[in-house]
């Protein structure tokens, strides 16, 4: 039986922009812009995973409480639709939080991160 994968991701908003990160060409989903996200490990909650993954990928520490805003249960990988569950959390920051990929534990997963507005 195929494993049902569970992930968590965070939409970080500052003013009218959200933070996205461009996946490394060597990682899954190469060169795609996405939310900082990753697998839920062991017995951690989806929110704990979202906060941990965000820190590991961006070196930004988020508060311990985020708003759950939705779920994604299908995704594309290598041109194939796969099933899984991604919990999507939201955090709005009053100040711009700047990722530091060089200091991030898993910063190698991305080539850069930047804020995008609806216009982009």
Tell me what each language-model feature is.
Residues 1-19, 36:
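Conserved N-terminal beta-strand and adjoining loop/helix that marks the start
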Residues 7, 16, 32, 84-86, ...:
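Conserved catalytic motifs of the protein kinase core domain
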Residues 18, 65-66:
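Predominantly a core beta-strand signature of beta-propeller blades
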Residues 27-31:
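A conserved beta-turn-beta hairpin within the catalytic core of GNAT-like acetyltransferases
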Residues 32-38:
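Conserved acetyl-CoA binding element of GNAT-fold acetyltransferases
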Residues 39-64, 71-120:
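Unchanged
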